[in-house]
């Protein structure tokens, strides 16, 4: 009975160690994945901001030129 308890305790101990090592490795893999996702989201936001900024400036430029042309021709 005593040797059975020792064997079971040893198996439990080894199983706990291997489980903790697997969890550490999995957590390390998950951390790397989060960094990649964050980079991907940042790049997407950056690209969208550039696109919106260019379009807004282009529209503002057109509106400004139309307004100046209107004032120059006294058609406003």
Curated annotation (Swiss-Prot):
Chain residues in the propeptide: 23-37
Subcellular location: Secreted
Family membership noted in the UniProt record: Belongs to the frog skin active peptide (FSAP) family. Esculentin subfamily.
Highest classification ranks of the organism: Eukaryota, Metazoa, Chordata, Craniata, Vertebrata
Reported tissue expression: Expressed by the skin glands.
Disulfide bonds: 70-76
Protein name per UniProt: Esculentin-2MT3
Predominant location category: secreted
Biological process annotations from GO: defense response
Domain of life of the native organism: Eukaryota
GO cellular component, one term: extracellular region
Keyword tags: Amphibian defense peptide, Antimicrobial, Cleavage on pair of basic residues, Disulfide bond, Secreted, Signal
Functional note: Antimicrobial peptide.
Span of the signal peptide: 1-22
InterPro entries for this protein: Frog_antimicrobial_propeptide (IPR004275)
């Amino acid at each position: 009975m005593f040797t059975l308890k020792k064997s079971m305790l040893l198996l439990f101990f080894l199983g706990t160690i291997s489980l903790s090592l697997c969890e550490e490795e999995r957590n390390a893999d998950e951390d790397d994945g989060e960094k990649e996702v964050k980079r991907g989201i940042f790049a997407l936001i950056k690209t969208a901001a550039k696109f919106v900024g260019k379009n807004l400036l282009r529209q503002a430029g057109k509106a400004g030129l139309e307004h100046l042309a209107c004032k120059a021709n006294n058609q406003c």
